[in-house]
Amino acid sequence: MPIIEIQCMESNPVISFENTEIAFKSKTDKELKKARFIFSSMDYTWLVKLGLKITPWAIKNKLPVNGLIRKTIFAQFVGGETLEQTTVIAEKLRKYNVQAILDYGVEGKEDEANFDLACDEFIRVINYAGSEPNVPFMSIKVTGFVRFAFLEKLHETILKGEGTLMKRFLKAIDELQGGEKEEWHRVRHRMMRICKTAAEKNVGVLVDAEETWIQEPVDALTMLMMDTFNKQKCVVYNTIQHYRHDRLQFLKESCQAAVERNFILGAKLVRGAYMEKERKRAAEKGYPSPIQPDKESCDRDFNAGIEFCINHIDRVALIVASHNEYSNLYATQLMLQRNLTLHHPHVHFSQLFGMSDNITFNLAHAGFSVSKFLPFGPIKDVIPYLMRRAQENSSMGGQTGRELSLIKKELERRKNS
């Protein structure tokens, strides 16, 4: 990986994602050795597959596995079981100029009482973030406060319509009957509460991406909130998954809508998290896969998305949420070419807590605005999140190998220093 020299008025920092001293300066030797053990375990695909089957079963049957999970994979990828525990991690990150994106990691509790409780918890997170300058964003999943089946039905109706996404969405809402109409009003009220509180507290809301078969109403609801709250500053961000072959065009159409409606488009760019599930469903149901044909196509669209956003930086607030070293370096190069300040309010970088510290901490050291995505919640509630992390790291052999090589390199450096 080449070293990129960055010219700026205040200093002349150099970014190298090979610098493990900077990457792991927040970690003790004990913490690094534990991380080495976890990533080494994830290198064994059969072990991960076994864990994916056994862990949910063990939790469901109340077997005493919480302690083991808490000390291993949970500690590596999750901030804590409560908001209060997570604030300790956020404060530790602050010492290294790394910010935190808080994510209340609860998924799939399908009843109105739990939807209201989840909404209340999102509000509590926003209120905390509003008092902490080191927590500029919080993340929400719309499925945390909306029935999956309701979103699925809306999605199917939207797809049948004609015209822009918003026209099709509003027509789908008009066609709702009786209880579903009331359900939509409750959904909109929850989303408005969250975004209004965030706007008042100066906290950004990152709306997580969902499966393709419920994504249309999520996109439309997010666009509706951006049209309401993003007039003067960017409060609401949509998450755009570039492992889908249609998302670069969607990004451009979203920007056009922002221009026409005079709001700032919030765009958190990711590669994606549901690839295997998407391919499997497409094959089972006999429709064309929404997934890119290969990794090169995904990388091409992701980097093109970064360039598009930076070329329209007055209208787009960009979050580069990536573990790909080239994409992060590419974004920094584009910023420099366009003479953007390192802490430009419309450019932010982010990586998951527990991964790619070499990117996060070296970007922070160089002066860029960067954060760790920091989920929290009871172990039983964040199991879906942890299962995805294990699955992704196992399937991304290169990523796991990269994490291991960097950790080993730093342990060796410390041993010899």
Task: Say what each PLM segment does.
Residues 2-417:
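Positively charged, amphipathic and often flexible ligand-engagement surfaces
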